[in-house]
Regions:
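C-terminal scaffold of the Radical SAM
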Residues: 1-216
């Protein structure tokens, strides 16, 4: 409650929760640090706050999620009046990760792209049925509740990121990101020295990013 009060004072009016899944087995398999119980506790707490709206993240197309479970998750989050925005992503398995190792060792099955496509279609149908809009390939919202911050990414507007690993962009050709280590980040703030990595985008970099983002 104290944190929410502080956020209100700072003008924050939306909180994004990385639920990923509402299935304990799936959370464990994807090496998520939180539990289903913690997710539900956070949802129930934040849903009581009338000054805050919520965005949630979900993952589909996993080896552990059936079509019926996916429908159930989509319907479940609609029961929370504060949830006005959804980011939904198909699971991808990156090289040199625990999941990639498990696939290579046949511990878990590889991603079924046909299954992911079916669940993507179920998502589109659900969004249409509840009257929301799909305004980006992975982002959906109640009318009037697009993510302003994320929209800045897609429209190449400047943005500023706070916290460890947070990325910022000057709107032209400089992109920079903060120290990723929590302890080192806090120490840097205490010493008033804000170390960050900087990338200067070339004209080709910007053109490639423009094409990639606009395809979404």
């Amino acid at each position: 409650a104290e944190l929410i009060e502080t956020l209100n004072q700072l003008g924050v009016n939306r909180i994004s929760l990385g639920l990923q899944s509402l299935n304990e087995l799936e959370l464990n398999a994807m090496n998520r640090a939180h539990s289903k119980e913690q997710s539900l506790s956070a949802l129930n707490l934040l849903n009581k706050e009338k000054t805050i709206t919520l965005s949630v993240d979900l993952i589909y197309g996993t080896p552990w999620k059936s079509d019926e479970q996916w429908r159930g998750e989509l319907e479940f989050i609609q029961g929370f009046s504060s949830i006005k925005h959804l980011s939904a992503y198909a699971l991808t398995i990156e090289e040199k990760t625990v999941l990639a190792h498990q696939v290579n060792k046949n511990i878990i099955p590889p991603i079924d792209e046909e299954k992911a496509a079916v669940q993507f279609d179920l998502l589109q149908k659900h969004i249409e049925e509840i009257g929301w809009e799909a305004y980006e390939i992975s982002n959906y919202c109640e009318i009037g509740h697009r993510a302003i911050h994320n929209s800045n990414y897609w429209n190449f507007l400047p943005y500023f990121g706070f916290g460890p690993s947070a990325h910022s962009y000057d709107g032209e050709n400089l992109r920079y990101w903060n120290q990723p280590n929590n302890a080192k980040y806090i120490s840097a703030i205490e010493n008033q020295s804000f170390p960050r990595e900087i990338e200067e985008l070339t004209e080709i970099d910007r053109l490639n990013e423009y094409i990639m983002v606009k395809l979404r």
